[in-house]
Curated annotation (Swiss-Prot):
It is found in: Cell inner membrane. Keywords: ATP-binding, Cell inner membrane, Cell membrane, Membrane, Nucleotide-binding, Repeat, Translocase, Transport. It comes from the Bacteria. Its EC number is 7.-.-.-. This is Putative ABC transporter ATP-binding protein VVA0347. Residues 3-244, 299-533 form the ABC transporter domain. ATP 2 binds at G332, K333, N334, G335, S336, G337, K338, S339. GO terms for cellular component: ATP-binding cassette (ABC) transporter complex. It comes from Vibrio vulnificus (strain YJ016). One of its GO terms (molecular function) is ATP binding.
């Protein structure tokens, strides 16, 4: 089932310029390819052309040709696309049509008037392929993120399509579930010989299993069509703002030259003996870092317990504290209870048991509004927080609610916008901003209120590496220069490793660890319990037989932090 784009371009109806430009790409039957690129590069648009959403659901101007199995798709009806291309979306909830898993998998067969006896055996066989055969009576909406993806996958496998398209399948998954998803996709690819196309930001996670080719896109064009080894041996990832595997960053920091023949796409195949001396010398340059923790407690949580349904606890007896000026992470798999902590601190829900004190004051004595003056929360999606048309008015909203006079409001808003690098946009409409800039507006709105604690819920969600690095470097600067206390809630292991100093780990509604981040990340048993995984930095240290794994990881963190600080200084000078 060959796919071929020839001189293919596409322009959205509402835009002046094309989003895809002169795409020439051939994907052979049975290949597994990955499409990567920064936000706005055109990779998702390319996927929508492949599955027929463009031009059937999304209108625009198409030029050039797209053929599937030698057939020109310009004349395809929508059903002809769906008979050949099955798509698993990032938002799996939007794909469910049945009340039970069995009904959802059977949907396509019912449309084809398949006999019940045949349908039953096909549904059972397909469910078994994705390890769901014991769950056919359950509602898909009651499942975890990884289980939901398997239901969506089964729904297209039962239709026996030849091409499987995955649009950012790892975006909402915790590390262990994401790893399992890549393994399931790989198993299906090897067993069925289907053509697999994966659109994804998280390149290192996708490379957990073999892929044939990687397509790098930027500005609506194909920049590179190459093997994983060729791409990772080149400077293209850094040039186009794509996060490279952590082990490669560490090796390059030590001055190790990585050639194509070294197989840089696979840590297990790298000739690490060749780099042993360079890595040892690099590590011996390390200065002993002591993350000084201030003795003054800002947030004190004791025996926090909460249940959404009165039966199963979302949190059970959780206790921890956050010192003033710390940069802390709360880790855990999807559904572990970590976001419940944010809701309890905000006052959106009240605990069944336990206490929360901020700067010595019992939060239960404060209203939601009063808490919002002390605790600033940045949600995953900035569009859920924004309520005004203009940037200035959005940042001024909280101050005006406090009854400040307009001159005070003006001065404070300009100060917050300047701090967030948005002062030149103060008279702009919010719709004109990028996703990352909108996030900065929400942060500016919170900083204007001078909160004592800043909490960010999954700050990397929906952002590519370049955008989220820019935002987190900014948050790091606020923490370093203004002493703002920051708590990040995430399951992005790279983010937590590079930016935070201490990790609070939640698993199955309970606190299982509260320790320096390097201690947590060098404890495979603990990470496994929390449905997290060790990073490739830890794997590299282990394979190099580093006796002090924690110190090795800390040195890497210090080097990266110094590099970020140096780049910030250079930008300020420029």
């Amino acid at each position: 089932m060959t796919i071929e784009f020839s001189n293919f371009s596409f322009r959205y109806e509402s835009l002046d310029k094309p989003t895809l430009r002169n795409i020439n790409l051939r994907i052979e039957k049975g290949e597994k390819i990955v499409i990567i690129g920064p936000s706005g590069s055109g990779k998702s648009t390319l996927g929508q052309c492949l599955n027929g959403l463009i031009p059937h659901a999304i209108k625009g101007e198409v030029s050039g040709s797209l053929t599937i199995n030698g057939q020109e798709t310009a004349t395809f009806a929508m059903h002809q696309f769906t008979e050949q291309v099955g798509t698993v979306l990032q938002d799996t909830d939007s794909q469910f049509v049945g009340l039970s898993i069995g009904e959802d998998i059977a949907f396509a067969l019912e449309n084809q008037l398949t006999a019940n006896i045949e349908m039953y055996s096909l549904v059972k066989a397909t469910a078994k392929m994705v390890d769901l055969e014991q769950m056919l009576q359950r509602s898909p909406h009651d499942l975890s993120g990884g289980q939901k993806q398997r239901v969506s996958l089964a729904g297209i496998l039962v239709d026996d399509v030849d091409i499987l398209l995955f649009d950012e399948p790892l975006a909402a998954l915790d590390p262990k579930t994401g790893k399992r998803t890549i393994e399931i996709i790989d198993d299906l690819h090897r067993k069925t010989g289907k053509t697999v196309v994966i659109i994804e930001h998280r390149l290192e996670d996708v490379l957990h299993r073999h892929v044939d080719r990687i397509i790098l896109m930027d500005g609506g064009e194909i920049i590179a069509d190459t093997t994983p080894d060729e791409l990772l041996a080149s400077p293209l990832l850094a040039q186009y703002g794509i996060r490279e595997p952590l082990y490669l960053t560490a090796l390059k920091s030590a001055g190790c030259h990585l050639a194509l023949d070294d197989h840089p796409s696979s840590l297990s195949e790298l000739p690490l003996a060749n780099y042993q001396h360079a890595m040892a010398d690099w590590f011996h340059q390390a200065n002993t870092t002591s993350n000084h923790i201030r003795s003054e407690t800002l947030l004190d949580v004791r025996n926090l317990t909460y249940s959404y349904d009165g039966e199963k606890n979302a949190l059970e007896g959780v206790s921890f504290n956050v010192q003033r000026g710390e940069f802390v992470s709360i880790l855990g798999k999807n559904g572990s209870g970590k976001s419940t902590i944010t809701k309890l601190i905000m006052g959106v829900i009240e605990p069944d048991d336990g206490t929360m004190h901020l700067n010595g004051q019992d939060l239960s004595e404060l209203t939601i509004f009063e808490r919002s003056q002390k605790v600033g929360v940045v949600m995953q999606n900035p569009n859920h927080m924004i309520s005004h048309h203009m940037i200035f008015d959005e940042v001024a909203f909280g101050l005006r609610n406090r009854g400040w006079d307009e001159q005070q409001v003006n001065d404070k808003v300009l100060e917050a916008l300047e701090l967030c690098g948005l002062s030149k946009y103060r008279h702009w409409p919010i719709e004109a901003l990028s996703y990352g800039q909108k996030k900065r507006v929400t942060i500016a709105s919170i900083l204007a209120l001078e909160p004592e604690l800043l909490m960010l819920d999954e700050p990397t969600a929906g952002q590519d590496y370049r955008n989220y690095t820019s935002m987190l470097s900014f948050i790091e600067k606020l923490n370093r220069e203004l002493g703002i206390t920051v708590v990040i809630i995430s399951h992005d292991m790279h983010l937590v490793l590079e930016y935070t100093t201490r990790s609070i780990v939640i698993a199955d509604s309970q606190l299982v660890a509260d320790a320096p981040m390097t201690d947590v990340f060098s404890n495979p048993a603990l990470l496994d319990r929390a449905n997290l995984t060790t990073t490739s930095l830890y794997e590299l240290a282990t394979r190099l037989n580093m006796a002090e794994t924690n110190a090795f990881m800390q040195h890497f963190i210090d080097v990266e932090k110094a590099s970020r600080l140096e780049k910030t200084v250079e930008r300020n000078v420029a």
